Amino acid sequence: MEHTPLDGKNQVAAEQIFGGRLPLAQRYVEHLATSGIERGLIGPREVPRLWERHVLNCAVIQELISEGASVVDVGSGAGLPGLCLAIARPDLKLTLIEPLERRVNWLNEVVEDLGLENVTVFRSRAEQAVGAVEADVVTARAVSALVGLVDITLPILRGTGELLALKGRSAAEEVAKTKKKLNHYGARQTEILTVGEGLLDEPTTVVRIQL
C-alpha cells in the first residue's frame, strides 16, 4: 500500500527533481511514512505532507551544489536533506552525521534498502566530528539557530566550502545576529536564497555562507 501518493504539482516537481530515480524517492517516502513514524523519526501528522513539506522542500536545494561535491549533512535525523540529495544526485558523496543510535540504525537500514552507494552514516555530534570528516558543502535543517549552527558546521568545511542552511521566515534576522561570527570565520559571502520558485507552492529558503 502506498501511504503517500504523488499527484498534481508535487508529481511534476518530483519528476523534475528526481528524474529516473523517482522510484527510489518514493520508496524512501514509504520508509518515512511507516518505520519512520513507528520509530519516532517523524510525526504521524506529517504523513500527508511528506512530499511537499519535507522531501521536495529538501531535494530542491540540489541545484545549488556543484557536480561531484562531497556533502556532510549535520543532524541528519530522518535523512532530511541528506538522503533526498543522495537520491537526486548520485554524483554527490554524502556523509550523514547523527548522534542518536536509533536514528543512525534507521538511516543505515534505509541506505541499504535503497542501495545508495554514495552515502555513509556517521554517528557523532557535529562538533565532535571536526577533524574526522570534511566536505565541500555542509547542509543543515532544523538543527539550531544560525548563530550556533556556524560553530558546529563551518569547521567541517574544506577550503573554500559553503554551508547551506535550510531556514524559514527568520532567515534574515538569524543572519543579522550571526554577522560577528561570520567575520570571525572569514566568510566571503552570505546570502539568502529562494529555491524552487515556480516548482513548489512554498519555495525553500536557504542561507548560503561561503568561506
Language-model regions, residue ranges each:
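A short acidic, Gly/Pro-enriched loop at the edge of an enzyme's catalytic core
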Residues: E127-V137
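Helix-to-beta-strand junctions that scaffold the AdoMet/dcAdoMet cofactor pocket
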Residues: R89, L157-G159
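Conserved SAM-binding loop of SAM-dependent methyltransferases across substrates and taxa
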Residues: A78-D91
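Class I SAM-dependent transferase core
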Residues: M1-V72, A88, R102-N105, E109-F122
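Conserved SAM/SAH-binding loop
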Residues: R123-Q128, V143-S144
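Conserved SAM-binding motif I beta-strand of class I
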Residues: K93-E98
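Active-site capping/gating segments
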Residues: R169-L211
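Conserved beta-strand/loop positions that form the S-adenosyl-L-methionine
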Residues: V74-S76
